[in-house]
Amino acid sequence: MLEDEYQLEFFKNNGFVRKQCQSCGKFFWTRDLDRKTCGDAPCDPYTFIGNPIFSREFDISQMREYYLSFFEEKGHTRINRYPVVARWRDDLYLTIASIADFQPFVTSGQVPPPANPLTISQPCIRLNDLDSVGRSGRHLTTFEMMAHHAFNKRDHEIYWKEHAMELCDELLTSLKLDPLAVSYKEEPWAGGGNAGPCVEVLVHGLELATLVFMDLKADKKGDVLIKGETYSKMDNYIVDTGYGLERFVWASKGSPTIYDALFPGIVNELMGLAGLEHELDNSEYANILAQNARLAGFMDVSEQSNLLELRKKVASSIGMTVDKLSAIMEPVEKVYAITDHTRCLTFMLGDGIIPSNVKAGYLARLVIRRTLRMMDDLDIRIPLSEIMDMHIKNMPEYPEFRENFPVIQDILVSEEEKFRNTMEKGRRIIQKSASHFKKTGEKIPLSQLTELYDSHGIPPEMAKEVASEIGVGVEFPDNFYSIIGELHNKAEEKEEEVVPFADRLKHLPKTKRSFYDEPTRLEFEAVVLDIFDNNIVLDNTFFYAEGGGQPADMGTIATAYAVYKVVDVQVYDGVIVHTIENPDGNLDIRKGDIVNGKVDEKRRMTLARHHTATHIVNDAARKVLGTHIWQAGAQKFEDHSRLDLSHYKHISPDELKQIELLANRMVMENKRVVTEWMSRTEAEQEYGFGLYQGGVPPGEKIRVVKVGDDVEACAGTHCVSTGVVGPIKILRTERIQDGVERVEFAAGVAAVRAMQKIDSLLSDSAKTLSVPPEQLPASVERFFGEWKDLKKENEKLKEEIARARVYRLLGGASEVAGLKVIAEFIPEADSLELQKTATELLKHEDVVTLLASDAEGVKLVASAGQKALSCGINAGSLVREMSKLVSGGGGGKPALAMGGGTDPSKIQDALARGLELVKEACK
């Protein structure tokens, strides 16, 4: 369908001919008149291994600089890389391509690009081939996509296909690449609702670059069909290129694998720690690695069947058995994967991702745990942070990673500890799950393995190992981690918001938000544009509509004859709807009326103080805890506010004190709160992506709020200066989910009231203990010590009572099949006494004990000595059945169990039932 798109003057004027690949059937352009295949794997093998294709070798830094300088000389503006966590996107967690930097606002034409044309080297992370990393010799989780982009409009073209092709060819020529070795393969591209013709740049079996010419958008009525979808022309059109930095380096060196080209020092270090020799100057060994990489280019090695096939082919080609080859390759592949994964983690953690069980944090933890598992397999006994430190030393272009390294180390210590704990707990969880499937005679299914990993972090390899001990089979695909990564790679699609009164509102203009122009004004006049169901739409308003975690303003709307209370304000597609209280149903307002609005000043100021305080506390937390701190959510109320922060551990009391002190210092500095409307591009360039802590607002213009050093895109109401906020008091913190700390605080009058409440509690407590407030800690500590001593004495006394009671109970025991059975109601005993008595009786192997009490509600305890256990008596089963009769429940171990209920009238029935069950078991 796009065949005509490739009929370029560039090809015609530079000696190219269009051919059809005899292997894959795709069309390609080449200067080599004798070429029969397209140059892509698997149609062509990797012939660059051992045969570098450029005139010189490059390392990563040298290649990146060569590329960017080349395009600067060709009129492109170099721009800085974006983070690998896509802070500017709400549909994507990780940056997967350079074009993702400019989606959706630049690519849609809403916002101008930061430069045009531009060049960038963008670090990207893709986990969809996670299981192929290390095995294939070429796959990476993290790679830099070098790119040159041009953003064109129909009335203003920067450059298009012809010049893009010329630039690419000139770059390759400047590297002294043999022109006959280059193929340009036609391959239509589609993704993310866009499409266009695409050219793959192929050399010696390796895809070095992809040139996408994005000029189509998904359209059910479109006339262009690509991969089963219809498209139509876009208003703008974009040159979207991607050159693989790491592949250029590999091709320049001709190393056996991409890992040896990129990280030779780290690979050698890890090989040594694993007790392996990595002698690339040994031609036989180097040939094994090279042949493995060459043949891996022909297949997907993430699947076991293909991996085995690869092993067979490599073994056959070098005259070695498959088992011997596997013994050589498997540990080497793990070293390669560890090297790659730790580089990936350097970018992830260095750019502020906090490992957790959700979103980008989940993906970071996935990579961490997979790495730790492989390190365990190879018995590499160094901290993860040591390997990351090696990477950071090799990346001077990223000084931020060195600055953040202390936090990275701390995060990894925490994550390794969690991983070890998971492994310990995981064994018990798997045993329980495997026991269930053993009863049914089934293998543990993939869905259960996925659940075990998602919910508990238990890797499938461990599940297989533990389950096999119980005799239960486990099978999982070799691309298990790729599947998991793909499942969690994208944000959940938001349900399309149902706009109430959509038909009613769609004809109305957007409401002017006058409170932005005059933030301190609270009274105003407005024209009624519509009124329905106690809802009023005005031409302009000073009422803030609920949004950004800030509740709506309240107040009144008045006519000459009546005053109506405003109880809610919401915004729908830019139209602000005021809901009024109208209990008698008589509404004396009509379209076109001029009304007077009055905002509740106390509520507005209280919420503005809390909103401004949220910025202040966020900034203080970042300064105390580290630059990784990211706002994960916020909500303001009149009496307090809460701020959710991404952080890898609990905030300590000392850190909270520092945050609170720093926040109040910012208040006392009385800095002006600055708000301004800026173009999105300008704001991002000046302030970075910390702008989007509160979410990503739409539009070309965004409202930027500066509170001290905190700068965010924010639509809320704020104080005119930090001094107006008043005192800030942190009330409490809690961990609401893994990786997220919630900080609750109050500001202004609410903070004073909170402090007064705390003072009252202290005063009342001091009064109760008859000591001055300043002596309260010492007094509480003394009383607590005395209480602990009394508790110990009480426990000793209960043990003595239990021992004394044992002889009496044994004397009244019943004989059942050679066992002594005690069934006794002890009304005065608490649960601890019952437990100690039953435990004491466990010393007698032939005794079964059934005890009950109603001193603390109905309590039941059962125990069974060793002889009783061998007869089939199970204390847990006894208690479960007895507890049912007293309207309760219970359970425990076969030797000792506890339970209870709410019906004391059935205690004797429960004891009788227990005795009956013992007799049945002894038959």
Swiss-Prot record:
Question: Which reaction(s) does its UniProt entry say it catalyses?
Answer: tRNA(Ala) + L-alanine + ATP = L-alanyl-tRNA(Ala) + AMP + diphosphate
EC number(s) of the enzyme? Answer: 6.1.1.7
| Keyword annotations of the record | Aminoacyl-tRNA synthetase, ATP-binding, Cytoplasm, Ligase, Metal-binding, Nucleotide-binding, Protein biosynthesis, RNA-binding, tRNA-binding, Zinc
List GO terms (cellular component aspect). cytoplasm
Q: Where in the cell is it found?
A: Cytoplasm
Q: Source organism's superkingdom?
A: Archaea
Q: What is one Gene Ontology biological process annotated in the Swiss-Prot or TrEMBL record?
A: alanyl-tRNA aminoacylation
**What CDD domains has UniProt attached to this entry?**
AlaRS_core (cd00673)
Co-factor binding comment: Binds 1 zinc ion per subunit.
Tell me its cofactors. Answer: Zn(2+)
For this UniProt entry, the molecular function terms from Gene Ontology, in alphabetical order, are:
alanine-tRNA ligase activity; aminoacyl-tRNA deacylase activity; ATP binding; tRNA binding; zinc ion binding
Tell me which residues bind Zn(2+).
611, 615, 714, 718
Q: State the Pfam families in the record.
A: DHHA1, tRNA-synt_2c, tRNA_SAD
Q: List the disulfide bonds.
A: none
Q: What does the UniProt record say this protein does? A: Catalyzes the attachment of alanine to tRNA(Ala) in a two-step reaction: alanine is first activated by ATP to form Ala-AMP and then transferred to the acceptor end of tRNA(Ala). Also edits incorrectly charged Ser-tRNA(Ala) and Gly-tRNA(Ala) via its editing domain.
Q: What is known of its domains?
A: Consists of three domains; the N-terminal catalytic domain, the editing domain and the C-terminal C-Ala domain. The editing domain removes incorrectly charged amino acids, while the C-Ala domain, along with tRNA(Ala), serves as a bridge to cooperatively bring together the editing and aminoacylation centers thus stimulating deacylation of misacylated tRNAs.
Q: Which family does it belong to?
A: Belongs to the class-II aminoacyl-tRNA synthetase family.
- Protein name, entry field: Alanine--tRNA ligase
Q: Which gene is transcribed and translated to give this protein? A: alaS
